[in-house]
């Protein structure tokens, strides 16, 4: 089913209702649109009892949501047009959860939104979050230790991490799938199916490594659909009102939860999913997927296998079919396994209670699904499809070797005074969680670290300034116990290097430089250089390292040099082309011919990456991660001398004050007003939306007499905010 605007009226009946309702719970009709405040207001709207439940995994609900996003886009060329239409639809009782999804897509991919730097608000703007502070709670929850919790509950601190869930929430705004025609709402994504497999496989690798740090077993994949969940799950107290839990030994219902209404395509029988599962496995083993043209199957190759396998799991048929030259994949045969599978888990927690706002379990929610332990069993199962394809289509890891010799790889703390600096080990810590951001048990972090490696060219024609040598360094880590499993390697960074002479260089990368990490601090704290939404779905900085062990847990670091360069990702649309020419997660994305063709039985990943003579473009080293505990997270953010009176007040011009008083009713010369709205001010100035330029001047061509804030000004304001907004002494 492909939705058009003509179909919208009938689809809206699924997720909205238009009876008499309390007007105070929605936007009042208005002719004036205040873009930033209206966007924040829409994302903060709670679901009311008279809203029809929204299931983000149901094809009908998804088509409605995508049609709403199209309506916002069709309302006019300016953001004001789309936001005005959103407010109109909310008056007609569109479910706010549906509108958040639709508006998030619209803002992420709208040219006007990108030019004006208006992005979807962070997760903390969701109505479930009652506070706006970025700072951890003063009264912390219990620190997580192995003798207080057992099994998957031990990892609740990791699953409930705010930054993990915020990252996942943004990922789904950028990458949309589930049967809709992406070319009609956000455009086609290059290698979208491969992205789907890679991202979720990396999530599983990180989660399993975290489990190993606590001596827990690896995740058991949900390969058998009549399996059961030994442990029950209940969302944290602030979510239990909104999403259901399930008791121990729960399993999928064979038909549907008997408490659920018999609504078409909200859930389907287990046997249908088993049929899709087996058909996809069979297609990978056979090396081809069936199409509607019996004599034109889609033949898998080394280059396309992961993209098509991932795309079919995620039901990205409209986009995939465009690659087939006139025929279509057999959707009846392969189905929509990913989303209906999550729906079967959500169905286990269904609550048939009058006025229930969201009767399903957390797996229907993009912002909260990783909190549920069943999420990880499901994605471990989906990883197996990638494993099967990766084994069937191996690769020669020398094919893209850079003509260099790598040596002296080191991963270590940045602090030279640390007792672990000379040993080349790293320290993590468990500190108090931000309970007001729905974290539980602890907050994982790490001391600042760096990695460096020596690079020397061995190219036949030596590099020079006139003829430089460009290459990419790719860094991974794995728990030493898991290093012989391709899919347990965690990607840490990719960096392009240019050599201009024969002498060896040492490439140094800080943890915050990582190309796979989010470019922001904890709790969505914006970085002025990376305010665009496209940078917000990387891996959280605080979770880049596994927690390790108190006595130190051994890890292996690996670096490979490939003969390519990776351009910086575009900060604004069009960003639909994946910028790395190699496979995602290369070289661990597929099996190695160096292993599959080995006849001695002695080859392994361990022996290959330690063989510098045969593979000089590869190097590795070992290090340990030591786990510590911090019972207090109070930090002093530099510079500490910034106060309201000596710095911040002077940042606001008379024109800024007049604009804010007119548009939003608060006074930028008033300390209390600025302190109350400091988060929004930092976000707007860091992303260059403010100070607002008038007349012939624009945000890209600002008035020299009324310039945008510099990076230093943003950093000072950030430090002032995080240090508690010190007032200082009035010089008057």
Curated annotation (Swiss-Prot):
Name this protein carries in UniProt: Cyclopenase asqI
Impact noted for substituting residue 314 to L: Impairs the catalytic activity
Catalysed reactions, as listed in the record: (-)-cyclopenine = viridicatin + methyl isocyanate + H(+); (-)-4'-methoxycyclopenine = 4'-methoxyviridicatin + methyl isocyanate + H(+)
Cofactor: Zn(2+)
Pfam families membership: Hemocyanin_C (PF03723), Hemocyanin_M (PF00372)
Domain of life per record: Eukaryota
Pathway(s) it belongs to: Secondary metabolite biosynthesis; Alkaloid biosynthesis; Mycotoxin biosynthesis
MF (Gene Ontology): lyase activity; metal ion binding
Keywords from the UniProt entry: Lyase, Metal-binding, Zinc
Result when mutating residue 168 to A: Impairs the catalytic activity
Mutagenesis / variant outcome for changing residue 200 to A: Impairs the catalytic activity
Result when mutating residue 338 to A: Does not affect the catalytic activity
PANTHER family found in the cross-reference section: LARVAL STORAGE PROTEIN/PHENOLOXIDASE (PTHR11511), PHENOLOXIDASE 2-RELATED (PTHR11511:SF4)
EC number(s) given by UniProt: 4.1.99.27
Cofactor: how bound: Binds 1 zinc ion per subunit.
